[in-house]
Amino acid sequence: MKKLGVNEIRKEFLEFFRSKEHIIHPSAPLVPQKDKSLLLINSGMAPLKPYFAGLEEPPGKRMATCQKCIRTGDIENVGRTARHATFFEMLGNFSFGDYFKKESLTWGWEFVTKNLELPVDKLWATVYVDDDEAFEIWNKQIGLPEERIVRLGKADNFWEIGLGPCGPCSEIYFDRGEDYGCGCEECKPGCECDRYVEFWNHVFTQFDRDEEGNYHPLPNPNIDTGMGLERMACIMQGVDSIFDIDTMQDILNSVCKITSSEYKKDERTDVSIRIITDHVRSISLMIGDGILPSNEGRGYVLRRLLRRAARHGKLLGVNRAFLYELVDRVADNYGETYVELVDNKDYIKRVIKVEEERFMETIDQGMDILNQYIEELVTLKETVLSGVNAFKLYDTYGFPFDLTKEILEEKGLSLDETGFESEMEKQRQRARDARIGADTEGWKEDIFSGLDKEIQTAFKGYTNFEVEGKVLAIVSNDTVVEQCDKGKEATVILDETAFYGEGGGQVGDIGTLYNEAVRLSVLDTKKGPHNQVHHVVRVEEGTIKIGDEVKAKVDMVTRMSTARNHTATHLLHKALRDIVGEHVHQAGSLVTPDRLRFDFTHFEGLTKDQITQIEEKVNQQILMALDVRTFETSIEDAKKIGAQALFGEKYGDVVRVVKVGEYSTELCGGTHVTNSGEIGMFIMLSEAGVAAGVRRIEAITGMEAYKYVQKNQKTIQEIADTLKTQVQNVVERVADLVHETKEKDREINKLKSQLASNSTGDILDKATVVGGINVVVEVLENQEMDDLRKIGDVLKEKIGSGVIVLGSSNQDKVNFVAMATKDAVSKGVHAGNLVKEAAKIAGGGGGGRPDMAQAGGKNPQKIQEALDTVKEILVNQLNQ
C-alpha cells in the first residue's frame, strides 16, 4: 500500500478519472450558486444538483471533482472524536446519463487497488439488499468473494431525500483489523464498531419517487460517488485520526507552537488544539470565498466557528488575536488546489484579526455582565444562575456557555442548564420556523422547474427595448394555466423578450406586454430555470392565452436610469481600488432606477478626503464620455485582460465583459449605458460599515443627482435667508453662532457651579450619622443628572468622609446620584446597590461602582419615599 499525502491522493484521483474521459471540474465556492435552499455547500454533489435535476446542461456527460465542503451539524463532536470536522473535501466521479453501475464499480476497484495499491484482502463492499446487479458486478466481474459483499437495508444502502431522484448505493470498506473490532464473530461492514471504515460511496440514481411512494425507473440513470479525502488519507497514512494526517499535522504543530501547548499530553488541551486546527481551515476557506462574519446565515456560521476557535485559544492561555497567524499554514497546505487562499491571504488574515479583536472585547464585556450576575447571586444568597441570564450572555454578548459554567464553578456556583437548554430550543425553533420549506439537501422543486425544458426564453434586451414574443407558459397562484383574465396577476414566459430578469444585483425591468386585444403591466422580471425569463404581470385589458403573440416593451425611463447606476458601480469599483487600495473587492450590490448600493471589502471608514477623491474620479470618467463596450470571451482570456470578477462567484467557460474606455473592465451580465457621459453626474450619499470588513456606499446618478443638488441649493438659500446673509457667507455665519453659543454655555455652567457650591453648605448642615458614617440624603429641585453629579462632587470633597445620596425630579423624570468616600466603601458601603434599590421604589433602576453610581425613575411622587429607604439599606450594608 502506498503512503500518500492528502495532495497526492487528490491529484491521483483526478488524474485517474481524467484518463477515463471525465471533465475535471474545479471545486465550486462554498457559497451555493443559484440555490437558496442551502446555507453552505455540504457535499460533493451539492453544486451539481442543477445537472442532476435537469435544470442546466452539464459541461460533459462525465465529470470528476474535489469539492470543498462545510458541515457544522456535529460541531460539538469536533475535536472530541477522531473523524469529525467542520471542513472536509469530497472526491467524486459523476455520470449524467452516460455510464452506470458496471463502470462506476470497476473503475472504483481499479483506482483503489492499482493506483492506491490498497491490499485486496482488506477490502469489502456493501450493496442494497435487493440490488442483485451490483452484487453480481462485485462478485462475478470484479472477483470480490461473496463473503466480503454485504447486503444492507434501505437505511444504509438506499439514497433518497423526499420526492424525486433516488436509488440504491454500494459502499467500499477498508478492514482495519481485529484490534479495532468488537470481538463478535459476525462483525462485518454495518457493525457499529471501528473495524470497518467506509471510504467510497457509489450512488446509482435510477429511480424517480412520486408522492405515493412509487419508484419509477429513470430513462437516463446517473452516477454520483463520494470519497472522503481525509478518511482515505487516514487509511493511506496508517493513522487513526484525521488530525494525524499530513496537512492537519502541519497546521496542528503551528497551533501548538503559537499557544505554547504540547499535543497528546492532556486530553482537554488536545481537544482545544484539534478544534483550532479544524476551525481555522473552515474559517480561511469561507472568507476566501467571500463570506464575512455576521449575525445571520452563513456569516453567523463563520462567526461562530471563529469565536469558538478563539475561545479555545483562550483556554490554552492565549489572550490576544492569534488565529490569523495560522492562515499561512492553511494556504501552504491547501493553496495549490484552492488558489483563493493564496490570492486573498492578506485579506483573509485581516478579516480574522479584526473579528478576533472584536471577540476579545466581547469576552471582556461578557465578564463585566457575568460579574454583575455573580454579585447579585451573592447579595441574594443564591447559588444558581438562571438559564435565562446564561442564555442572554451567550446570545446577546457572544459569551461561551462553557466559559460561564467554568467561572461559576470556580466561585462555588452553578447554572440552570435545563433553563439554558430551554432558551436554546426556543431559538432553534425560531430558526426552524424561518427555514420552513427549505429541504436540507435542497432538492425541493418549484412549479417552474417542472415545466417542459423546451420552454426557454431568448433574451434580446441588450440591444432592443421592444421585441415580439410568443406566450409559452402562464403560471398563476402556483398553477400552470391556459389563460389569465383582466384584473389578475400571473407570471408569463415568452420565447423572446427584451426584459432583463433580476440578477447580478440589478433589479428586473418593468414595462408592458401588449397586442390589439390584450395589455399587461410588467411589474417585475426575474430569471428562472432552463433559461426562462419570468414576466410578473397584471392583466390590465383582455385575456392573455398560451400561444398569443405579444410585443414586449421595456419602460425606457427606468431601464436607462438603472443602466446609468449600473455603469456607475463599475466606475466606483475601479475608483475605490485606485484610491483606497487593491484589496478592495465587490462584496455585493443593488442597482435600481433610483440609486445604487455598493458593498466592498475594507476595514475602516473612508476619510472625507478619500470620499472627495472617489467622487471626483468617477465624475472625471463621466465627463470624458468614454465608450462602453460589451463582448463575450473565455474566462481565461477575460482574466488575461484584467477583468474584475465578483468575489466568491463562480463563472462559466464563456463570460460577458463590460469595458468602460480603458478605465474599467469587469465581468457582468447586466445592462449598461453606451457612453459614460450618459450617466450625467455621480453623487455619494453615504458610506458606512455593514459587517466586519465590509463597507457600503449609496449613491445616485442622472436626474436623481441633479434633483439632489437642486434641493441642497434651495436648503442653503433658505438658511442664508434665515441668517440674513449671503450664501457664500453661510458657513462663516454659522461658525460665529456656534462660538457664541459655546461662550454662553460656559457662562451658564460657571454660574451653575457657583450655585451648587453655595447650596452645599445648607445641605451639609442636614447630615446625619449612620453606623459611624456621615450621611447626606437630600431632594433637590429641577436638577439634571449632570448638575446632580456636580453638586455630589462638591459635597463629597467637603464631607471628607461619608455617603451622599441626592435625588431630583424634572417633569416626569427622576434622577438619583450616590457617592461614597474610600473609607466608607472599605466599611461595606456600595453606592451602586444603594441607588439601585432606591430607584426601584420610584419605578426605575440603575447602578454603578461602589464609590459612585446613578439611576433613574419614572414616578416623581415616590422620590422622597425612595430616599427615606437609603439609611435602612445603608445599615444593612454595614452589618453584612
From Swiss-Prot:
GO biological process: alanyl-tRNA aminoacylation
Catalytic activity: tRNA(Ala) + L-alanine + ATP = L-alanyl-tRNA(Ala) + AMP + diphosphate
Record-level Gene Ontology MF annotations: alanine-tRNA ligase activity; aminoacyl-tRNA deacylase activity; ATP binding; catalytic activity, acting on a protein; transferase activity; tRNA binding; zinc ion binding
Alphabetized PROSITE patterns for the sequence: AA_TRNA_LIGASE_II_ALA
Keyword Coiled coil set for record: no
Record's keyword annotation contains Methyltransferase: no
Protein EC: 6.1.1.7
Gene3D superfamilies per record: 2.40.30.130, 3.10.310.40, 3.30.54.20, 6.10.250.550, Bira Bifunctional Protein, Domain 2, Threonyl-trna Synthetase, Chain A, domain 2
Annotated keywords: Aminoacyl-tRNA synthetase, ATP-binding, Cytoplasm, Ligase, Metal-binding, Nucleotide-binding, Protein biosynthesis, RNA-binding, tRNA-binding, Zinc
Chain residues that bind Zn(2+): H566, H570, C668, H672
GO CC, alphabetical: cytosol
Cofactor(s), by name: Zn(2+)
Subcellular location: Cytoplasm
Enzyme class: ligase
Annotated cofactor note: Binds 1 zinc ion per subunit.
Known function: Catalyzes the attachment of alanine to tRNA(Ala) in a two-step reaction: alanine is first activated by ATP to form Ala-AMP and then transferred to the acceptor end of tRNA(Ala). Also edits incorrectly charged Ser-tRNA(Ala) and Gly-tRNA(Ala) via its editing domain.
Family: Belongs to the class-II aminoacyl-tRNA synthetase family.
Record's comment describing the protein's domains: Consists of three domains; the N-terminal catalytic domain, the editing domain and the C-terminal C-Ala domain. The editing domain removes incorrectly charged amino acids, while the C-Ala domain, along with tRNA(Ala), serves as a bridge to cooperatively bring together the editing and aminoacylation centers thus stimulating deacylation of misacylated tRNAs.
Record protein name field: Alanine--tRNA ligase
Organism expressing this protein natively: Alkaliphilus oremlandii (strain OhILAs) (Clostridium oremlandii (strain OhILAs))
